[in-house]
Amino acid sequence: MKDIATPNRTKDIVEKYGFSFKKSLGQNFLIDTNVLNRIVDHAEIGSESGAIEIGPGIGALTEQLAKRAKKVVAFEIDQRLLPILDETLAPYGNVTVINKDVLKADVHEVFSEQFEEGQDVMVVANLPYYITTPILFKLLEEKLPVRGFVVMMQKEVGDRLAAKPGTKEYGSLSIAIQYYTEVETVMTVPRTVFVPQPNVDSAIIRLLKRPKPVVEVTDETFFFEVVRASFAQRRKTLMNNLSNNLNGFPKDKELLDRILTEVGIDPKRRGETLSIEEFATLSNALVLHKLS
């Protein structure tokens, strides 16, 4: 049987079931097996590994994962795809398709039901563009015991995840993802290898979870509030952004100026110039004056 991810086989499956693509679900099917193999290779899936997929579509990536992994669990929100997946994944007895929105699912419950304790598990997915960041944050914040993620996403979002201080892509998203994971851009994927063709190019990004966050912070929630406030208006200085946007902190510019100076950060700098280490130092100093 030919791989699913070829133009002809994809076309045949779509026509056979009279499937119409829903733009609202970000449905773009990959038709290049080489790209799929790069995704699976970088996930380093072995014969004892597990994989979680989100948005399997007609099963193109699922099929490649099933050939290598011990167990594959795929979350698919679109009921119309279930009979198609029943057919395309019939040769593989190690795949479970769950008809749920991953953002609303109890992922810990699914994880404990489907995988063995201590099993090596990766999240491997061609993520729907419109919910890429909510999915990543849900799985990171809920501390799902996975080794990491190899995910395809809009190139622009991938650039933001991997961005360094001082670049226009760098922002609160870069810091939040790099706080939890090591980020690597595997490759750029042209829009031409999808059906239907999206308006933008994609990128494959690998995120490997750190054993512990990259910096030590006294109050994690407050740390992220400081980061978000610092980027509230990109053209404004740290001083302006923090005095106007940091909730739970006294509206006292003199105090703010003193703390910034004490930790060696010029109040006139902009948020995009600070490293994650500087944000941690700043947050740990500011939290001492937080309003209770």
Curated annotation (Swiss-Prot):
Query: Which residues bind S-adenosyl-L-methionine per the record?
Result: 28, 30, 55, 76, 101, 126
> Matching SUPFAM superfamilies, A to Z?
S-adenosyl-L-methionine-dependent methyltransferases
Catalytic activity reads:
adenosine(1518)/adenosine(1519) in 16S rRNA + 4 S-adenosyl-L-methionine = N(6)-dimethyladenosine(1518)/N(6)-dimethyladenosine(1519) in 16S rRNA + 4 S-adenosyl-L-homocysteine + 4 H(+)
PANTHER family, sorted: DIMETHYLADENOSINE TRANSFERASE, DIMETHYLADENOSINE TRANSFERASE-RELATED
- What does this gene product do? Specifically dimethylates two adjacent adenosines (A1518 and A1519) in the loop of a conserved hairpin near the 3'-end of 16S rRNA in the 30S particle. May play a critical role in biogenesis of 30S subunits.
Q: Which family does it belong to?
A: Belongs to the class I-like SAM-binding methyltransferase superfamily. rRNA adenine N(6)-methyltransferase family. RsmA subfamily.
The molecule here is called Ribosomal RNA small subunit methyltransferase A
